[in-house]
Amino acid sequence: ANPGVPLPPIVLYGPDTGRPMSSSVDEGKTFWVPKVSAKYDLTDDLACAVQYREPWGIHTDVGLNTFRSYTAIEQKITSRDFGINCSYRIPVGEKGYFRILGGVSYQELKGYQSKLVPPGTPFGGTFRVATLDVEDRGVGWRIGGAYELPEYALRATLVYQSEVKYNLDGTISNLAPIPLNVNSDVAAPQSVEFKFQTGIAPDWLAMASVKWTDWKSIQSIAFTSVNNTAVGLPNGRKITSLDLYYRDGWTIMGGIGHKFNEKWSGAATVTWDRGTSTGWTSQTNLWLFGLAADFKPQKHLSFRLAGAVGWLGSGTLKDTVSTSDFGNDLVTALSLTAKVKF
């Protein structure tokens, strides 16, 4: 809002139902994350893999008849990543190896947000739901190294993933008499991950990982006007923004695995993920407890079924419209993996 210009009043009754607006919401939605990859050994020491994955994603929906509908009703971010990774193995000593790791990715990113707009805002009108749709494509890369000692099932890996820059283009609909063209610059954050595993006894494996993600690089994402002179908006004028104000993300995992026989093995893990929220979002600290079972019916075929139960911490959510308190929440995840060797 401009200094000295009062904000329009926020009613306490839902414009769609006429009933009092709810002060309690359930914003999280279920979503799935597919991943497909294929690896080929070009030589004894050189191997490459192509993959498809969806690295970034979120889906929340608080509904229309809530106080938070003035900030955002539904928010959805989807991504697609088409990548290739290669590794080259170099002998080190009598039994060890060092691997050089590298890869590139082509990524697509789409964002959607809907928001309740009251009367008295720019362009006038009655209560209505405005929507933001944007998308773009970008390229990222990664590089790293690994040390392996197969005799002890030991492997240590360090990988750096670059940021992926996007110049998001799209429209805001139902705010003005005609759709408004908007633009914004944002980058998917860079990250560094260290993984380690080693045998600790016959058929027993210990594993751990630490990952840092530069989420603090994402603060407020402004969407500015592009070619909207028909409604009196100059180029570069901010129309809306997505205020996140993240802090750095840290993810720490520890676990243990056991091979029961030639066909069955399992693993148990504990993961702590430091929330990126600074009070503007609900991404608080997360504890996740996972179990996995691997079944290998034959030499060239294996399956993995894994599940996790997590505890998402409580917090307070503050933005320009409202202040909300939320309690601890239960989160669950389930994954199924199949691997075929040719």
Model-derived features with residue positions:
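Surface-exposed strand-loop-strand hairpins of Gram-negative outer-membrane beta-barrel proteins
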Residues: 1-30
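Outer-membrane beta-barrel porins/channels
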Residues: 6-14, 33, 41-342
